[in-house]
């Protein structure tokens, strides 16, 4: 200000010009700063909205993942692990009169099974359909390794027959799964021999509710009988036993012919 007082007109003009330039410069700078700010604000808004979008997506995927895991848990809880296996094995029946003929082709009989094997429950539920070439009865068989029981439901008679599980005949579920795997892959020679069981229905069982849920479901509301091996029967009226039938199945790498007789 003091300087201005001594300024010549040219100096004043110069000063004005300088001020003009400064004003211009400062305006430009301000505009630049403003533009920068606006830009920054604009980019921030953009980042903000995409961030919100990401969060929403993340949240949604968490909810979805939760639903999937929850659903899987509920499914696993309510639907026990089980797989249905199908298999066929053939056997040579030396007692079949057709096979005792000399020079005749050996007559192999097929046995087909459908098995629901539940390793978690230690149980095998075997369905024997109506056989096409033999006199065996269709049946549903339960081998319950937890309860140590076998139940035969003869589907022609509608009766249940129960006996202790014979672990030297029946393979554990894990090995049965392997056997069916081998049968399915065709790597296994499905020709085998027969083991015969001769059983007698000795007494009626009125209450099957203490034999496990699986046997209960199979045999509840049906006539149920306890089976005994004929060779272990002492003092039993053997002549009174007249009706017999067979169930052929494979609880192992061989066929078991279960003959059940009843008065
Ligand atoms: C299991 O079955 C086999 C073959 O039939 C027999 O030799 C064995 O005595 C049976 N075991 C029991 C406990 O019945």
Swiss-Prot record:
Residues that span the membrane, as ranges: 54-74
Q: List UniProt keywords, sorted A-Z.
A: Disulfide bond, Glycoprotein, Membrane, Signal-anchor, Transmembrane, Transmembrane helix
Q: Where in the cell is it found?
A: Membrane
The membrane topology noted for this protein in its Swiss-Prot or TrEMBL record is:
Single-pass type II membrane protein
The SS bond pairs are 160-219
Question: Residues in domain BRICHOS?
Answer: 133-227
List of glycosylated residues: 166
Any GO molecular function:
amyloid-beta binding
Tree of life domain: Eukaryota
Which terms under GO biological process does the entry name? negative regulation of amyloid precursor protein biosynthetic process; plasma cell differentiation
Any one annotated GO CC term: Golgi apparatus
Q: What InterPro entries does the database record attribute to this sequence?
A: BRICHOS_dom, ITM2
Family according to the record: Belongs to the ITM2 family.
The protein's name is: Integral membrane protein 2A
Identify the coding gene: ITM2A
């Amino acid at each position: 200000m003091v300087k201005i007082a001594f300024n010549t007109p040219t100096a004043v003009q110069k000063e004005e010009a300088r001020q003009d330039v400064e004003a211009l410069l400062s305006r430009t700078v301000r505009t630049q700063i403003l533009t920068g700010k606006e830009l920054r604000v604009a980019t921030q808004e953009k980042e903000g909205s995409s961030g919100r979008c990401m969060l929403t997506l993340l949240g949604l995927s968490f909810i979805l993942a939760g639903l999937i895991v929850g659903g899987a848990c509920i499914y696993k809880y309510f639907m026990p692990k089980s797989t249905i296996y199908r298999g066929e094995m053939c056997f040579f029946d030396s007692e079949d009169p057709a096979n005792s003929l000399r020079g005749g082709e050996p007559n192999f009989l097929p046995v087909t099974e459908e098995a629901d094997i539940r390793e978690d429950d230690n149980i095998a539920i075997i369905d024997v359909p109506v056989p096409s070439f033999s006199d065996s009865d269709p049946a549903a068989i339960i081998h319950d390794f937890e309860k140590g029981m076998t139940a035969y439901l003869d589907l022609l008679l509608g009766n249940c027959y129960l006996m202790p599980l014979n672990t030297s005949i029946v393979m554990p579920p894990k090995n049965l799964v392997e056997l069916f795997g081998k049968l399915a892959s065709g790597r296994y020679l499905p020709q085998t021999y027969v083991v015969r069981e001769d059983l007698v229905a000795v007494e009626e069982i009125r209450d099957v509710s203490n034999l496990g849920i699986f046997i209960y479901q199979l045999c509840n509301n049906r006539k149920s009988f306890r089976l005994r091996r004929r060779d272990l029967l002492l003092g039993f009226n053997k002549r009174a036993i007249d009706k017999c039938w067979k169930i052929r199945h494979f609880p192992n790498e061989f066929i078991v012919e279960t003959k059940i007789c009843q008065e």
